[in-house]
Amino acid sequence: MKYGIVGYSGRMGQEIQKVFSEKGHELVLKVDVNGVEELGSPDVVVDFSSPEALPKTVELCKKYRAGLVLGTTALKEEHLQMLRELSKEVPVVQAYNFSIGINVLKRFLSELVKVLEDWDVEIVETHHRFKKDAPSGTAILLESALGKSVPIHSLRVGGVPGDHVVVFGNIGETIEIKHRAISRTVFAIGALKAAEFLVGKDPGMYSFEEVIFGGE
């Protein structure tokens, strides 16, 4: 598979290149603040950079008819509309978290909340001091799995890649469910799984859950 990275020189960009190269995939497109280096035609473009970069990413995907794996957070409606339009021409996977564990947790929460429907629920998320958006896209994703609005507490400290705790409470007992990303590698592994999934797919919007669970 030939692939491109938007945000190539960033921390996630470097992690993505490392994981993809270990699987023998060829990097043919590099995009960062210094410009664009085009070495070939990618099958898939991976972008974990910023919402501001999305117009250029969309332009490149259209140019090369390349699928898009998008892990950028803090997207606005205008960005989502760009993706909907792009998905008419190429396959797209967009997710706020490419950790397989988080997406398994999301599915689990959607079932658990049916049993604990009268319990209090709150979410606590912790990320590194450089993360700009709060609450995190992942916390919002987990809230959506609960099917209702719940309090979300955001901490920005040190170099934490990502901790999410969902707390259920009732009189006399609590349940805490925690997911911890130990390194950014987990997100790069998820991006790889999504990129390989997209190769040969028809145009359209695909969820990361479809990548993991198939058509279930």
Curated annotation (Swiss-Prot):
The active-site annotation reads 127, 131
> What's the encoding gene here?
dapB
The main location class comes to cytoplasm
State the GO CC annotations. cytosol
Under what name is this protein listed? 4-hydroxy-tetrahydrodipicolinate reductase
- The keyword Cytoplasm appears for this protein: yes
UniProt function note? Catalyzes the conversion of 4-hydroxy-tetrahydrodipicolinate (HTPA) to tetrahydrodipicolinate.
Q: Per UniProt, where does (S)-2,3,4,5-tetrahydrodipicolinate bind? A: 128, 137-138
| Keyword Oxidoreductase in annotation | yes
As recorded in UniProt, its EC number(s) are 1.17.1.8
